[in-house]
A protein has these predicted regions:
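Short, conserved turn/kink motifs that form compact alpha/beta structural patches or helix kinks used as
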Residues: 1-6, 21, 26-124
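N-terminal helix-cap/turn-to-beta initiation motif at the start of protein domains
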Residues: 13-17
Length: 124
């Protein structure tokens, strides 16, 4: 089996795990239907198949008296889905809608992209 076929099969396998749909929003100026330039949120991508994954880390050390738990949130999407850092990502997964913010560049693979997310707390 050649690499291209292997990547195609691996991508199909990964995409079978996608349980969510994402809408991606960006903040900036845009011209509305009346030709007026306005600042605000615009829809950049709609109904993107995805999966949100959560990973927790216990950061307790011997000198600390209390446990501290950190959580990494990752978004898995197709390799052709490019999301700018700072974009708002609205995800519907497992009947729950949550708004996140893309925090940086994606880890890009031939089969998918992984974006680190954090909870969205409004536009900066």
């Amino acid at each position: 089996m050649d690499m291209e076929t292997a990547y195609k099969l691996a991508r199909q396998a990964i995409e079978t795990t996608y349980r969510g749909i994402a809408n991606v929003y960006q903040y900036g100026s845009a011209v509305d239907e009346h030709g007026i330039q306005r600042e605000g949120e615009t829809l950049a991508m709609q109904d993107v198949p995805c999966k949100v994954s959560f990973e927790s880390h216990d950061t307790t050390s011997q000198t600390e008296t209390a446990n501290s738990l950190t959580q990494k949130i990752r978004l898995f999407v197709a390799p052709d889905c490019v999301i700018d850092a700072g974009s708002k990502v609205e995800v519907v997964q497992d009947s729950t809608t949550t708004n996140y913010k893309s925090t940086g560049q994606a880890a890009t693979y031939p089969t998918h992209r992984e974006y680190e997310l954090e909870l969205f707390n409004g536009w900066a």
